[in-house]
Amino acid sequence: MSQQNLAKLISLAFTEDRVFNDKTSDLCLAKNSQTSFAIKTREPIIFCGKEIILEVFKQLKQTKKFKNSSINIEFFGNDKDSFKSGETIAQGKGCARLIFASERIILNFIQHLSGISTTTNQFVRALNNPKISILDTRKTLPGYRFLQKYAVICGGGKNHRHNLSSQILIKDNHLASSEKNINELISSSKKKYQNLKTEIECDQYFQVLEALKSNPDIIMLDNMNRKNLIKSIKEIRRANSKIIIEISGGINLENIKNYRDLDIDYISIGSLTHSIRAVDIGLDILHP
């Protein structure tokens, strides 16, 4: 996780939420008021966001308003750990105004990211085949990609390419817009970008046959019906066993078990990041 990018994102959240002008807390709480709190799960989760909690408190304490404020926190687990419903992730004590200023920002981050890690882990367990990796995609929120991809790792998944420069991925729209055919595009890519992997997206069996002429590093079988999917996998393995096979499109928690026994390497799932449900985590004030 990039600490520099995280610091910038948290700073943006402070500005957005006007944390230094919390009129309600200033009205209700004395400046030196202290309180204890606990961050608890309200459903089973795979946790992601420990560094975010620490960074939020750290940045607030460095500001003029809270520079003399105290905050102490103890964690009862780390990123990637599982928590049952009702369990405490962290507990602490400190300046009440600081805690209320940070509450919603912390929860927004960790509910979303723990939602990604929890769902990713559900896919990994439903697939139940360690030889096949669950991958994310670039279908992420602007500015949040590094966090969302980190959350996928916390859930037991792996990252696909991080940006447009990190790997060649020739998709259907490229094929529709280019004057070159599949074979020519793969050959050009391997010659020009020898330090990058070249991947080709195929949604038809004839495209697989064309792609195999140039031996791409990865072939993505996208939205293929079962018959063509199995036929394509067999042909790829017959032609070149070193080619990585990725499948994608329409795969969910209900049907992923249908792909468990296929001779493939990756399953990429856009819903891990683009339509995730935030998990239920709360920050509760503890009374003596």
Where are these regions (language model features)?
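Acidic/glycine-rich phosphate/pyrophosphate-binding loops and surrounding catalytic core
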Residues: M1-D203, Q207-L209, K213-S214, I218, ...
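Short amphipathic alpha-helical segments
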Residues: I219, I285-P288
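Short secondary-structure boundary segments
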Residues: N223, G249, S271
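Short acidic, glycine/proline-enriched helix-loop-strand junctions
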Residues: R238-I244, H287-P288
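Short glycine/threonine-rich catalytic loop with a Thr-x-Gly-x-Asp
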Residues: I247-S248, I285
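Cys/His-rich Zn2+-binding cysteine-cluster or related metal-binding knuckle/ribbon modules and their
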Residues: L253
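Conserved, well-ordered active-site substructure
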Residues: S268, D280-I285
